[in-house]
From Swiss-Prot:
GO annotation, cellular component aspect: cytoplasm
Official protein name in the record: Trigger factor
InterPro entries with a match to the protein in the record: PPIase_dom_sf (IPR046357), PPIase_FKBP_dom (IPR001179), Trig_fac (IPR005215), Trigger_fac_C (IPR008880), Trigger_fac_C_sf (IPR037041), Trigger_fac_ribosome-bd_bac (IPR008881), Trigger_fac_ribosome-bd_sf (IPR036611), Trigger_fact/SurA_dom_sf (IPR027304)
Stretches assigned to the PPIase FKBP-type domain: 162-247
Reaction equation(s) it catalyzes: [protein]-peptidylproline (omega=180) = [protein]-peptidylproline (omega=0)
Source organism of this protein record: Rickettsia massiliae (strain Mtu5)
Gene: tig
A Pfam family assignment: FKBP_C
UniProt subcellular location: Cytoplasm
Amino acid sequence: MGITVLKNEGLDFHARISTPLSEIDDDIQKELLDLTKKVKIAGFRAGKVPVSIVKKKYGTSVRNDIIERKINHSVNHVIKEHNLNIIGRPKIEELQNESDKALEFTVKIELLPKITIPDFKKISLDRPKLEVNSKDVEEQLEKLAALTKNYTKESKAKIKAGDQVTIDAIGYIKEKAFKDGKLNDFKVIIGSNALIPGFEKQLIGSKTGSEIDVNVTFPENYHAKDLAGKDARFVVQIKAVHTAEPTVIDDEFAKKFQSNSLEELRTHFTKQIENESEEAINTIMKMNLFDKLEKLLDFDVPESLLEQEKNILKSGTDKNEQDESLLKDKSSKEITAYYNKLALRRVRIGLLLAEYAKSKNLQLEPDDLRKVIMQQARNFPGQENMIFDFYKNNPRAIEGLKGPALEDKAVQYIFNHEIKLKEKKYTKEELEKYLEAEEQRITLI
């Protein structure tokens, strides 16, 4: 076998490989002889089929199989001999395999970069810490009480905030009834903001049996595009008004929610608030870590990974209105530059974390995958069981989560064992403002 290196620079390795025809022919002959002992052909006893007959029937497929095996063997030999750290499948080009010539082909191999892991101990980050107070917990209890109110008492008085109102309504745009603009026996709590902004407020002061006009403007980001931003008039009939019986928040109330006492329910809400904030805090900290890593990493990345990441970004932006709006006023040149920079950041950090996980021998456990699946499910409120079933029945989809799961595990290891974390305490209100500002800053990263 002859090997001529054509290119060995950066992350590209190209070589021309040739194998003498005699080697190919010898292997073909051995394969055909072996087949004479196995194949069954009408008119011949088992194991007594002449080589010429076997060659006539199977010669082409045997030759193709031998050539494919020879190519794979040769490529693997080159990879071992040159100690190549490859990514993806080698590309075979300019193949010459005519029967009267040697087997020759060019192999193009893409390489993984050599990655130097930075000294994480030189990196420091703020770690927001939520201090849950009694006011935060009481707000959650009040919300729960509001959700479980019993609207049993019918009222003849004027509608006020907090009342449950049953209505029929027909919507008109430019005096023409529009599709899906009709409500029948619809129950709404005044002040819940369940309807279009301004709708509920205009019901206040009316009574059961009255008919009123409600004038509203659909929000610009309304889910029905044909209604977004348009003025509408609803003819509303007030069919019934009910007031809620006062809800007493005590131990008996807590028992309705699998708690033995009100104090136990308060403890539950304290932990829930902490857990909900923890996920958001981790996401922000992860992005802040990546910001610092982006400035430290400068190695080349495989072109195939870069293109793959750019395609993922573009396809994700097409489906995300918020992301799309950030780029709508940009020129094609600016958009391309943006995708190039963002894709490079993601690929570099992904490769670094994979190398770091390998260096620390971090292995995925079932719990790691469960956490990632839970995160995916939380993106689809009300459809969690469907998401769980999807991953349960699709092993390939699970495979696709292993990369992100290992990345998360590496990041958590870095937080716990490497970088310096400076704890900074926030109230719930302060933390919400901080997280909102940070989320706007890292949009699309």
